[in-house]
Amino acid sequence: MKALWAVLLATLLTGCLAEGEPEVTDQLSWQSNQPWEQALNRFWDYLRWVQTLSDQVQEELQNSQVTQELTVLMEDTMTEVKAYKKELEEQLGPVAEETRARLAKEVQAAQARLGADMEDLRNRLGQYRNEVHTMLGQNTEELRSRLSTHLRKMRKRLMRDAEDLQKRLAVYKAGAREGAERGVSAIRERLGPLVEQGRQRTANLGAGAAQPLRDRAQALSERLRGRLEEVGNQARDRLEEMREHMEEVRSKMEEQTQQIRLQAEIFQARLKSWFEPLVEDMHRQLANLVEKIQSSVATNSVLSTSVPQENQ
């Protein structure tokens, strides 16, 4: 658990440092393994084509086909991101509730930034279409130049948004795959390059500029460590309370079982005391009846023997 806060802190530092970099690569830096990444790549490829501002692009911009296609690609990307985030939430291991909420909030913020910049791009293309219509066939080269500049800026923003979202989803995925303490080593391995990159960027900063950042990072890490330890202690206390409660329930159940057994034995003894006199009385009556029957049979035998002798 203590190593998890360090990984999260390194990811946060990397994201903060990335905001100060003026240059952004033109290619996405991951392989398209997840459906949301594949959907984003389709959006990215289409945007690259739009940025050429070729005659075909100009024609499709005028009839709204470009904005319609971008809308579909945006919705597909956001839908896949939501589905992937939900899948990770269902797989999330026994992470502390505060950690779970913080990870979800960070992913939600990155997702919102990407969606907002996509929406901004679509609105800018719609604005360009309206401006061209207003020009009524006049020279639109200046409009096209401004749009090209804006598209380059938007492309960089979208690239940063996409990479930030991917990094935060990677942290979320690591937590879902490994759980809390059981996943620390695996999270470190998966995010090792990211942590190293953050360290290198921090080291490259000037000593004067880096020291305040290190101080803030140290203070933040101390707060995170203290909070994580507090949450861990609370979880252990809660587990101990549950164990004591279960032991109390078990004792009560054993006591109730013993009482039921004693009551059953008492009831059995009562039944025996009720029915034994009846059985004994029935035995006596049956014995008397048998004795009477035997006596009667003997008497009849004597009488039947004496009658033939008298006739002779």
Curated annotation (Swiss-Prot):
It comes from Arvicanthis niloticus. Belongs to the apolipoprotein A1/A4/E family. Residues 258-312 are annotated as: Homooligomerization. APOE is an apolipoprotein, a protein associating with lipid particles, that mainly functions in lipoprotein-mediated lipid transport between organs via the plasma and interstitial fluids. APOE is a core component of plasma lipoproteins and is involved in their production, conversion and clearance. Apolipoproteins are amphipathic molecules that interact both with lipids of the lipoprotein particle core and the aqueous environment of the plasma. Residues 72-247 are annotated as: 8 X 22 AA approximate tandem repeats. Keywords: Chylomicron, Endosome, Extracellular matrix, Glycoprotein, HDL, Heparin-binding, Lipid transport, Lipid-binding, Oxidation, Phosphoprotein, Repeat, Secreted, Signal, Transport, VLDL. This is Apolipoprotein E. Residues 202-282 are annotated as: Lipid-binding and lipoprotein association. It is found in: Secreted; Secreted, Extracellular space; Secreted, Extracellular space, Extracellular matrix; Extracellular vesicle. GO terms for cellular component: chylomicron; extracellular exosome; high-density lipoprotein particle; low-density lipoprotein particle; multivesicular body, internal vesicle; very-low-density lipoprotein particle. Gene3D superfamilies: Apolipoprotein. Residues 270-282 are annotated as: Specificity for association with VLDL. It comes from the Eukaryota. GO terms for molecular function: cholesterol transfer activity; heparin binding; phosphatidylcholine-sterol O-acyltransferase activator activity; phospholipid binding. APOE exists as multiple glycosylated and sialylated glycoforms within cells and in plasma. The extent of glycosylation and sialylation are tissue and context specific. The lineage of its organism: Eukaryota, Metazoa, Chordata, Craniata, Vertebrata. Residues 150-160 are annotated as: LDL and other lipoprotein receptors binding. GO terms for biological process: acylglycerol homeostasis; cholesterol efflux; cholesterol metabolic process; lipoprotein metabolic process; melanosome organization; phospholipid efflux. Heparin binds at M154, R155, K156, R157, S221, E222, R223, L224, R225, G226, R227, L228. Residues 1-18 form the signal peptide. Pfam families: Apolipoprotein. The modification Methionine sulfoxide is found at M135. Homotetramer. May interact with ABCA1; functionally associated with ABCA1 in the biogenesis of HDLs. May interact with APP/A4 amyloid-beta peptide; the interaction is extremely stable in vitro but its physiological significance is unclear. May interact with MAPT. May interact with MAP2. In the cerebrospinal fluid, interacts with secreted SORL1. Interacts with PMEL; this allows the loading of PMEL luminal fragment on ILVs to induce fibril nucleation. Its main location: secreted. Residues 150-160 are annotated as: LDL receptor binding.
